[in-house]
Structure formats: C-alpha cells, structure tokens
Amino acid sequence: MAKREKKSYVIQSVGNALNLLEEFKGDRDELGVTELSKRLDLHKNNVFRLLATLEAKGYIEQNKATENYRLGVKSLELGQTFIKQLGLGRQAKPFLREIVEKCNEMAYVGIIRQNSVIYLDVEEANQMVKVDNRVGWRIPIHCTAIGKVQVAYSSEEELEKLGILDDMERCTPNTIVDRGEFLKHLKEVAKQGYALDNEEYNLGVRCVGVPLRDYTGRVVAGISVAGPSFRMTDEVLKKEIIPAAKAAGEKASKRLGFGA
C-alpha cells in the first residue's frame, strides 16, 4: 500500500524532464531532438515541449549554430551548489591553505563551465597588496593559468567544442590571441605540468595554475596561485610558487582518487 501511494505522487512529465537532463551526463556536450527522442522513447513533439520548458527556465540552451541543445546556466548553478556542499571546493580547501601558508599569496580552485572558469573557493593571503578574486566569479580560459592548465590536455577538437579558439579576446598586450601560438603554448603547459599567466589577463598580476585529476585521470579542476608581479618574480615562481602549487595539486588529486 505504501509503495502504491508513493508511486502515485510521481509526476510523469517531471520525470521525463529529469530523464532528459540526465542524457547530458555523458561525453556528448550537445544532443539533438531526434537523438533525445530515441534515447527517451518519447515522441519528438513531447521532446520539443520538454526542451522549450527547460530552455525557458534556463536549464537547457540551444546552440544556434548546430541547433542542438546543451545544459544551461541554471543546471550549472545547481551543480555549483552541489560541488560547494560536497565536492571540489571542500576537498581542495586544505591544500589552498597549505599554499598560502608556504607562499603568503592567494590560492583558489576553479572549474571550467560554459566557456569560462568559475571560482569554487578562494583562500586569501595576509598581504596589503592583493589580487581581488571571489567565489563564483567567471574568468576567461585562454588568458588565465587556471584556465589554460585545464584545457592543455584536450585535443584540438575538444578545444573547438569549448569555443575558445575562435574567441580569444586580447585582455592585455601579453594575451595570446593567435590560434597556432596558443595551441603550441598549451603543448608546453601539458609537458611541464603547470601553466603561467604572465600578466595575460590583468596587467601587474602573475599566476601559476596546476591541474586537479580525479580517479579516472581526467582533469576536473585547477588550483591557481595569484599575486602582484613585483612579488611574483621569476625567481620566486621557480623556487617557491611553482613547487608549492604542484605539490598541492598532487595531494588534492590524490584525495580525489587519482593514482589510487
């Protein structure tokens, strides 16, 4: 009786909408109406209505170029809340503190979503002159250490899907905006295991970024250390910042199951 009563509360249309959202969990970033119809075993008209409703609420968005659909900002916001409560931000927190204790520079963790990096957590340093970064802020991928280090292990095709190769805004005179030069730079980042932002996003600010990997070896986030250029000299980067960042990234990745 109890099971029958519980089942009676299930709303089929809501269930269909949630099933549709779950189809975007795999490797495919975008899906079309026909494929969703087959996967969900629903008529195309029903899929259209579900997509229209979810799009109106911001949980799904349409790529106008391909006419396929992908997750929208609202889905991202729900994911951010979950991560903040249970995931990466909390997992990385002690390692951010470790960096700050060693280097006395700001450290933060971020993930790539919707063609930008989103900060999940920030650990401040006790400095009079500091970089202004806050949880929830979005920054570009192509001109930041935390962005570049997360895409450095991606194929050119994957980078195309992210949409950053054709939209590399020049934020400072140091920003790399040439496609070929950027791809060459990413290969070097992947080889050395860390990325540098040499005043590419903000003049007067330098950053180091290292990857965070999960139990599959996939890069799921990045840790970065940022500070004013007059403190983040080449010597300081080499002797203090880069070793501390790499050590923290390795420990955080191990906590996420990498190498287990």
Annotate each language-model stretch with its function.
Residues 212-215:
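Sensor-regulatory modules in signal-transduction proteins
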Residues 80-128, 153-156:
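All-alpha effector-binding/dimerization core of bacterial HTH-type transcriptional repressors
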